[in-house]
Amino acid sequence: MSTPRIKAAIIGSGNIGTDLMIKIMRTSRHLEMGAMVGIDPKSDGLARAARLNVPVTHEGIEGLRRLPNYAEIGVVFDATSAKAHLTNNALLQKDGKKVIDLTPAAVGPFTIPAINGDANLEEPNVNMVTCGGQATIPMVYAVKRAVKRLVYGEIVASISSKSAGPGTRANIDEFTETTSKAIEVLGGAERGKAVIILNPAEPPLIMRDTVFTLSQGGDREAIEASILEMAETVKTYVPGYRLKQKVQFEVIGDNAPVRIPGIGTASGLKTTILLEVEGAAHYLPAYAGNLDIMTSAALVTADRWAARRLAKEAA
């Protein structure tokens, strides 16, 4: 007897959507592909989906709603843009679909599996922050849980230019705004800042991330232990996630405090964390760790939701 699965649709046939489709077909425990949706009839993602016998449409959200199997689809991943998501989500909520938002729209609550895994599973829409956020905010949170006060968190995400499709490029401002907010909401920093760099180097370089925090009332050994534990947690769903170098510390004394917008001058312990994310190469090569961490986090979240729903239906 085959294991019951919930049908999933993906809106957005670009790099992220195509990588996610392959992950669902190869690794998902509780989902199966029900549709791939795009707006470019010549996109590689739609062509691949068609070759894999996945129902496709190049007519966007309205095309999805017209597909014969639309009623069977239980969860929809939106990998379009922040602006498009607002329209898509309104229609999907009206139709009673579970929505996993891979855009920076942040309509639903921020979700990072390593931090608040199951907390928002019953929400109709959950937001996966950004690729940079998925990679770095677990580290901000790791520092937060080991200190009394996390004054500041700043992340710099460097991704290969080749891995950034038109959707990513159109959402740069939303990326920084959403990631900065999530550093505060999920990471626990009083003030957050995010920077993204599209690296044009050839051959393409692997995703690299730097995390800076300023904390007070913490022990270096406890902070480092928390960081190492968090790295192992993320690695359970993103095997290519790792610390690039040993955690670095620097004391910022009262005699030379830093100025933080919205807070003022502050001193404490500066922690620097250097990360590397190697992709699983399901679609783009291994340098595209930014795709891998985003789609892996989304799939883990959806699989957990699906497992809960299937268990309820079987009860």
Swiss-Prot record:
- Which InterPro entries does this UniProt record tie to the protein? Acetaldehyde_dehydrogenase (IPR003361), Acetylaldehyde_DH_C (IPR015426), NAD(P)-bd_dom_sf (IPR036291), Semialdehyde_DH_NAD-bd (IPR000534)
Which residue positions are annotated as catalytic?
Answer: C131
UniProt keywords, alphabetically = Aromatic hydrocarbons catabolism, NAD, Oxidoreductase
Please give the CDD domains that the UniProt record associates with this protein. Answer: ALDH_C (cd23933)
The residues that cross the membrane are none
Q: From the UniProt record, which GO molecular function terms apply?
A: acetaldehyde dehydrogenase (acetylating) activity; NAD binding
Q: Which reaction does it catalyse?
A: acetaldehyde + NAD(+) + CoA = acetyl-CoA + NADH + H(+)
Q: Please state the Enzyme Commission number of this protein.
A: 1.2.1.10
**Residues where NAD(+) binds:** S13, G14, N15, I16, S163, A164, G165, P166, G167, T168, R169, A170, N171, N290
GO BP terms in the entry: catabolic process
* SMART domains linked: Semialdhyde_dh (SM00859)
Q: Which family does it belong to?
A: Belongs to the acetaldehyde dehydrogenase family.
Q: Tell me the protein's name.
A: Acetaldehyde dehydrogenase
The top of its lineage is:
Bacteria, Pseudomonadati, Pseudomonadota, Alphaproteobacteria, Hyphomicrobiales
